[in-house]
Amino acid sequence: MACNFRKSNLVEIPDMFFGPEQILDGGPWYAETHITDNLIVEPWNAFSSLAIAAPAVYFLWKIRKEPTQYAFLLACIPFLFLNGLGSTLFHGLRTSRIFLLMDFMPALILTLLITVYFWAKALPKWWMGILAVTPVFLMRFGIIDLIPGQGGINASYTISGIAFLAPLFLILRKYDFKKSFNIIGGSICFILAIYFRQIDKQAVDIIPFGTHFLWHIFSGIGAFLLADYLYFLRNQELRPSKREIA
């Protein structure tokens, strides 16, 4: 896999992630990107990123009395919050590759964790989940290298989405399809999020600052629905004889 590195004083980042459309901070141009002396470079993209961090704050508050009982959800919360915070700083300032890493690395790790978790729930042995997920994530990096720019990034998100949604039918069936709305609604939100991410620059005639901010908003809604489903699953394990009705 071809992978050239660009150096900065802070960190080395491979070109394979970004393609030819990046600017000085290593990230791509968006419809809203206008490098000026303004304090906030991309206000819509920056403030909408808070929608990603919001579910992390909500569920941290929700499990505050018994956090250790919800160990997996608790482990996911920092990555979700860092993703939202990193996206806010990245889009707002466009000055640091550290913020760029915070924009996508927590999401990458979080997607991997949840995908392995769902496959481990669906398959007889937990290690089978790791075996099922590994080639998918190798494919994700491969497609970013094959398709430059935003197209490759969007394709990688699509692959990740399919990977962690695939085992959910077995999990839904196990719990009599309770909370199906979370999975259906979350899937629709993630599909819409990727769609709006893809058409960001094509939609400027309708929305002058593009549609990337809708990627953040629908991702935040989808993250909330998914976190709520993780909360539900854990409650089923804690109270197997008194399963909650969706």
Regions of interest found by a model, annotated:
Residues 5, 9-246:
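Multi-pass alpha-helical transmembrane bundles in non-GPCR membrane proteins
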